[in-house]
C-alpha cells in the first residue's frame, strides 16, 4: 500500500500527532483500509478518528482520506482537531472530491 499526502495534510498532521502516532494510524489503515466511516455524498471519502494526548479518539483528531483500491493507494487529504471543526462543509467536500478526481481520474 502506498500513502500519498496533500501538502495541507502533511502540515496539519505534524501539528496534531507525533511520528509514532502517525505511524500507528498508517499501520491501522494498512491492515484495514476501510476502517474509516464513509462520508455521505463524498464520492468515497472516509473519516477516521485519531486519539490525541489527553483527549482520546472521541475528542481527538479526524483524518479524511480516500482509498483507491485498484492502485492500492491511500490518499491522505485533510487532518483537523475535533474541537476546531465537527464535519466538513459542503465547500470542503467539493474541493476534496475534485482533488481525488484530479489524482485518480
Question: Positions of the model-derived regions?
Answer:
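Arg/Lys-rich, positively charged N-terminal/basic patches that mediate binding to nucleic acids
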Residues: 1-20
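Short Gly/aromatic-enriched secondary-structure transition segments
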Residues: 13, 25-26
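Amphipathic alpha-helical transducer elements in NTP-driven molecular machines
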Residues: 19-22, 58, 93
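A short, surface-exposed loop/turn module that caps and links secondary-structure elements
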Residues: 27-57
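Short, surface-exposed coil-to-beta transition loops
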Residues: 59-63
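Enriched for short, Lys/Arg-rich terminal
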Residues: 67-105
Amino acid at each position: 500500500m502506498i500513502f500519498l499526502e496533500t501538502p495541507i495534510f502533511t502540515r496539519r498532521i505534524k501539528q496534531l500527532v507525533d511520528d509514532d502516532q502517525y505511524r500507528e494510524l498508517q499501520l491501522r489503515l494498512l491492515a484495514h483500509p476501510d476502517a474509516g466511516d464513509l462520508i455521505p455524498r463524498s464520492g468515497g471519502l472516509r473519516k477516521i478518528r485519531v486519539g490525541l494526548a489527553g483527549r482520546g479518539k472521541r475528542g481527538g483528531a479526524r483524518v479524511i482520506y480516500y482509498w483507491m483500491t485498484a492502485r492500492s493507494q491511500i490518499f491522505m487529504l485533510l487532518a483537523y482537531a475535533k474541537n476546531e471543526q465537527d464535519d466538513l462543509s459542503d465547500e470542503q467536500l467539493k474541493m476534496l472530491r475534485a482533488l481525488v478526481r484530479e489524482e485518480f481520474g
